[in-house]
From Swiss-Prot:
Higher taxonomy: Bacteria, Pseudomonadati, Pseudomonadota, Gammaproteobacteria, Oceanospirillales
Natural source organism: Chromohalobacter salexigens (strain ATCC BAA-138 / DSM 3043 / CIP 106854 / NCIMB 13768 / 1H11)
Gene3D superfamilies attached to this UniProt entry: Vaccinia Virus protein VP39 (3.40.50.150)
Name of the molecule in the record: Ribosomal RNA small subunit methyltransferase C
Subunit details: Monomer.
Keywords: Cytoplasm, Methyltransferase, rRNA processing, S-adenosyl-L-methionine, Transferase
Claim: Cell cycle is one of the keywords in the record: no
Keyword Protein transport among UniProt keywords: no
Catalytic activity: guanosine(1207) in 16S rRNA + S-adenosyl-L-methionine = N(2)-methylguanosine(1207) in 16S rRNA + S-adenosyl-L-homocysteine + H(+)
HAMAP family: 16SrRNA_methyltr_C
């Protein structure tokens, strides 16, 4: 089987024997499963795919690697600060001197890796370049800087928020989320006692805002960094909510009085409507009769058609030409 993604195509042409290596933050590419090894990823769908093939999976942000690995390959993410966190985390998790390769696309900023490695005191050499990607090689070392240093705390909407590189809206309040918060009192009334699910929770701002007003909140996100950020945000604001990884409703059970969301529509640099469409189409099954879905989206996105198909009708609660807040109610039967 041939590699599908450009970074994996570059790796495929190497003479390196990657058997039993650790793949870190990899893309979906079936070629990796033919090579073997283990995976360390914050993406729930990546972890699920590797578990389905019986491969070792590390899903924690600070895993304990029980067996040594001959080397690791880090797939450089589009968020540079997140890539730097992975470097710190790998140096903390792996024995000193473990071979570490970094691969990524030029348009994703992989060439900036050289400066990041130099700043950490890690030597580096260029191994190969093709398919508009570059592969670098270095070795892990004991570093003075901890991965914990990547976390950011800031204030917004009367809340204390914890955020991490790679999490949506990192370090600031997104304009769409701000608009959604402004209309939530109209949409939900008094949230006290309501069971509310935040899908695509990011740093947990929606759940925290509802939780401090008495709602029973739960939050899910595909990304382990977002789940960790949400848990920290809940703790910082005294909210007794739950947060866990889930691909939309994949690991959600039970019914809710309301579902709130600022759903993603990008996968890396490409537009991907899949998660938002699933959210809308599957929401009625997760709502009690009379329960409501309240979400914000860029005005150009095709959500009205999906809302009509799933709920029959919907209401626009706010529209500033950039963002729209939609509300749809599950009919009582």
């Amino acid at each position: 089987m041939s590699a599908e993604t450009p970074p994996c195509q570059l790796l495929e042409r190497q003479s390196e024997a990657y058997r039993d290596w650790l793949w870190v933050a990899p893309p979906h590419d079936a070629w990796l499963h033919t090579v073997g090894g283990s995976v360390w990823s914050a993406d729930a769908t990546i972890c699920q795919a590797w578990r389905a093939r019986g491969r070792p999976v590390h899903a924690d942000l600070a895993p304990t690697l029980t067996a040594p690995v001959p080397g690791a390959v880090l797939f450089w993410p589009k968020t540079h600060a997140l890539g730097e966190w992975w470097l710190l985390a790998l140096c903390a998790a792996l024995p000193e001197g473990t071979p570490l390769q970094v691969v990524g696309e030029h348009q994703g900023g992989v060439k900036r890796v050289l400066k990041s490695l130099a700043a950490l005191g890690l030597g580096c050499r260029k191994v190969d370049s093709a398919r508009r990607c570059t592969l670098y090689a270095t070795r892990t070392a004991r570093l003075a800087l901890s991965p914990e240093a990547a976390w950011t705390r800031f204030e917004a909407a009367g809340l204390t928020l914890e955020s991490h590189p790679g999490v949506f809206g990192h370090g600031k309040l997104d304009d769409g989320t701000r608009q959604l918060l402004e209309v939530l009192p109209t949409a939900l009334g008094d949230p006290a006692g309501q069971r509310v699910l935040d899908v695509g929770c990011g740093d947990g701002i929606l759940g925290a805002w509802l939780g401090v007003r008495g709602a029973q909140v739960a939050a899910v996100d595909l990304d382990a960094f977002a789940v960790a950020a949400t848990r920290r945000t809940f703790q910082a604001n005294g909210v007794a909510g739950e947060a866990w990884q889930s691909d939309v409703f994949g690991d959600v059970s039970g019914s809710y009085d309301a579902i709130v969301s600022n759903p993603p529509f990008h996968q890396q640099r490409a537009i991907d409507y899949g998660p938002a469409e699933r959210l809308i189409r599957e929401a009625p099954a997760r709502l009690v009769p009379g329960g409501r879905l309240v979400l914000v989206a860029n005005a150009f996105l095709p959500y009205p058609r999906w809302l009509e198909d799933a709920f029959g009708e919907f209401t626009v609660l706010a529209d500033d030409r950039r963002f729209r807040v939609y509300q749809a109610v599950k009919t009582r039967r």
